[in-house]
A protein has these predicted regions:
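Bacterial N-terminal signal peptides that target proteins for export
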Residues: 1-7
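Cleavable N-terminal signal peptides
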Residues: 7-8, 18
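Terminal, non-catalytic domain-edge segments
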Residues: 21-53, 142-186, 233, 237, ...
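N-terminal substrate-binding region of glycoside hydrolase catalytic domains
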Residues: 23-82, 89, 93-100
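Solvent-exposed loop and edge beta-strand segments that line ligand/cofactor-binding
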Residues: 43-63, 70, 74, 117-136, ...
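Extended ligand-binding groove/face enriched in aromatic
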Residues: 54, 75-230, 353-362
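Long, repeat-rich segments with strong aromatic
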Residues: 248-332
């Protein structure tokens, strides 16, 4: 069934357009329309930065809003969308523990024994505060914005339209440079001293005491990818600037071994459709990855692949797409897709979903035949009506598909 026919049926059932409050997807094929762009732009103006300075900026609404704006800026090059992305990044950076005033919840002592440049992952009442390699995700979000600015030199000397409330830099380039500087600062002062085990090929490990979270264990893969995302995007920014080649080399020497480590942990399998798939652990040495956390593995694979730098080919990522499309989506239990990458379902994070988590939409790049099925899952569960990242990713993938067809 064509995507336009799908939407005709859906619209007939609802007697209304597919709306995420103010957001609209008019069809799943053709170019992204100005109506779709305007609706997204209007909607995000009503979505304020979330309260707090913790994981809400990792995998919560704050971090996801940044990524969504970036994708829609790639589609539209609409400066108002970039400005909203900058707004979220500014709010996030301003709330970093060492920058945020104590009376607002900052200046917390972290498990390492002092105030650290992190966004604490523990609740505000936990002492000492927790933080780990997931800090990479905030850096990745912020430097996605920096990358988009650096890719558009016509913006560099223009004043940022929304102003500079936190003195991060009044022009677009100055703002990008500040984001890069602060990202490198967190890597230098938090990540490198604690989480890179040089004696084991620069792999990501949690330290021992006084850290109590997974002490001396490998980082779970979803968290590992969050850190890899940060390093990849910082490398991309430094390449665009053609600066700090020593740092690029040092980051590459961390990124590639950790990607290789992940790839070496994969266990090949075959789906009921006969496609090559993989299973892997949530964290080494054993176990089975759940589909909540595997979403971040998928996002990380895409970010590294898109950079074109880390020996990941199109064919390397097809089995991950097969795993999600043929095993996870192909196994329905009590109305939900499988909760683990082997097709089984458990509870909690392994309980499964009746929708497609937004990060998995990247995998439609490698299984274009499944894009409409993914979109139908979002539509039928009402996710398009409420999810900024899902709507943005669907429109972004729609745009890529249209441009590929137009280029043929």
């Amino acid at each position: 069934m064509s995507s336009r026919a799908l939407f005709v049926i859906f619209l007939a059932m609802t007697a209304a357009p597919v709306i995420a409050q103010n957001m609209v997807i008019e069809s799943l094929d053709g170019p992204v329309t100005q109506t779709e762009i305007n609706a997204f732009k209007a909607h995000i103006q009503t979505v304020n930065a979330p309260e707090g300075n913790g994981n809400v900026w990792v995998f919560g609404n704050g971090g996801k809003s940044i990524e969504a704006c970036g994708l829609m800026y790639e589609v539209s090059h609409d400066r108002a969308i970039l400005d909203r992305m900058i707004y979220y990044c500014d709010e996030m950076l301003s709330r970093r523990n060492d920058l945020w005033p104590a009376e607002k919840g900052g200046q917390r002592i972290v498990w390492a024994g002092k105030i650290e440049p992190v966004w604490p992952s523990s609740n505000p009442d936990v002492k000492p505060a927790g933080a780990g390699v997931e800090q990479g995700d905030e850096i990745a979000h912020m430097n996605y914005c920096a990358k988009l600015i650096l890719q558009n030199p016509s913006l560099w000397n223009e004043k940022v339209t929304i102003g500079d409330a936190y003195n991060f830099g009044d022009t677009y380039k100055a703002r990008a440079l500040r984001y890069i500087k602060e990202g490198d600062y967190v890597i230098d002062n938090w990540i490198l001293p604690h989480f890179i085990r040089s004696s084991e090929g620069n792999h990501y490990y949690f330290p021992g005491a006084p850290n109590t979270y997974k002490a001396n264990e490998p980082a779970p893969w979803n968290q590992a990818w969050m850190l890899t995302n940060a390093l990849v995007r910082l490398v991309e920014c430094h390449l665009l600037l053609n600066d700090d080649h020593k740092r690029i080399t040092s980051y590459d020497a961390i990124i590639q071994p950790n990607i290789n480590w992940f790839i070496s942990s994969l266990r090949p399998s075959t789906s009921a459709k006969g496609t090559l798939c993989y299973t892997w652990a949530y964290a080494l040495p054993r176990g089975m990855e759940d589909t909540n956390h595997a979403a971040y593995d998928s996002e990380g694979l895409w970010i590294a692949y898109e950079s074109g730098r880390y020996k990941l080919t199109f064919n390397d990522l097809v089995p991950f797409a097969n795993t999600y499309c043929d095993v996870v989506m192909g196994t329905i239990t009590n109305g939900k897709f499988a909760g683990r990458v082997d097709g089984s379902t458990g509870v909690g994070h392994a309980g499964g979903d009746n929708f497609v988590r937004d990060e998995y939409i990247y995998l439609a790049e490698f299984r274009p035949d499944m894009f409409e099925d993914m979109a139908k899952a979002e539509i039928s569960t009402g996710k398009v009506a409420v999810s900024v990242p899902i709507t943005a990713r669907l429109l972004w993938e729609k745009d890529r598909r249209y441009k590929k067809r137009a280029a043929k």
